[in-house]
Amino acid sequence: MNISPTPKRYNSRGDRYYASQARGKVPEFEPYRKSGLNFNDGYSGINPPVYKNGLHSNLDDDKLVPEEIKLQRTVINDLISQNKELQTTVHTQREEIERLNIIIGQFRAKLTKYSVMNRKLEDELRGSERSSNALNKDRNDDRNDSILENSFENAEDYIQIPKLRYNSKGKQDKSPQTNDLNDRLSQLVQLLEKSQQNNSTKINSNSNDMSPPVCSSATPPERNNKPIMSSPKIRDPSEEDILCQESAELKSLENQIELVKKKLLIKRENELRKLSLENELIELMDQLSTDASPYRYGKSKGNFISTSKHEKHDENLSDIYGDYTGKNSLRKHNIKPFNPIKMDNILETPTPPNRRNSE
């Protein structure tokens, strides 16, 4: 059986209408039936055609539409376009703000990283400066010791000259010049011996702080074969060293102050917490006492009797008849006085008075 569509389905007028409507063009043709109801008429009121954006394509050219509606349409379109533009600008600004926030976070992380690195490097620099100062001090001490050791004159370094012994029989020629020279030499030898003794005593007493001995310029050139080096002076602390030391002391003081402040804050918080807990405990104890006092148990009626009424009645009777009538009134009503709760055993389960009496 052939199920292929008939040619009428392809060539029908309705198919042409819907195909042209999909393309955006509505063909003008007569209605399907010649009646008063035209379904393809835009102003018939029954099933009007639906156009793009719910409006007629030729609304501006239509004469039946008033001009106010046309103006409103243009204004609304302008507002919609402006709203879209503003939304796009807001969206772009938000994206820029997010991007800037990301950049700020990266810079903050880098700042913290480099600050930590800077602190570590400063600590290392201070440690290296201390070690270098200690090494320089040790070197200076060693150099001073070596200079002092070299400055002492050994007996082996001198040229031993035999003394001239004059015969008693021979003639001794003594001139005043030779006598003066001999006296000067003897004085110089004595001075050198004294200086060597003083230096030896100083070395034994203070081995760390040594200064080279002052050599006299009047010594003979034969004995001063070795040049005496002057001891290097110890370097004085510079302004940078003083500032670094002061900054370190200030930082240590600031850290101590912060620790003391933290301890004081913790102490105050603990005191306030203690006071608040004590107040809560007092309030809870008052609530327990008030919850237990307003009711008493009566044997005659077998139910709870409020104590406030009886207390008022007893007060009135005591005013009239005295304390004796108040006690008798309690006996007449068979009401036992309330036993106060002991505060030692607050957490125990309460037992009714009937069971207590039975026990």
Swiss-Prot record:
**Pfam families, alphabetized:** Spc42p
Q: Which domain of life is it from?
A: Eukaryota
User: Keyword annotations for this protein?
Assistant: Coiled coil, Cytoplasm, Cytoskeleton, Nucleus
* UniProt GO cellular component terms: cytoplasm; nucleus; spindle pole body
- The chain's coiled-coil residues are 67-289
User: Where in the cell?
Assistant: Nucleus; Cytoplasm, Cytoskeleton, Microtubule organizing center, Spindle pole body
Q: Which InterPro entries match?
A: Spc42
Q: Return the similarity comment.
A: Belongs to the SPC42 family.
Name of the protein in its database record: Spindle pole body component SPC42
Q: Which organism is it from?
A: Candida glabrata (strain ATCC 2001 / BCRC 20586 / JCM 3761 / NBRC 0622 / NRRL Y-65 / CBS 138) (Yeast)
Gene that this sequence comes from: SPC42
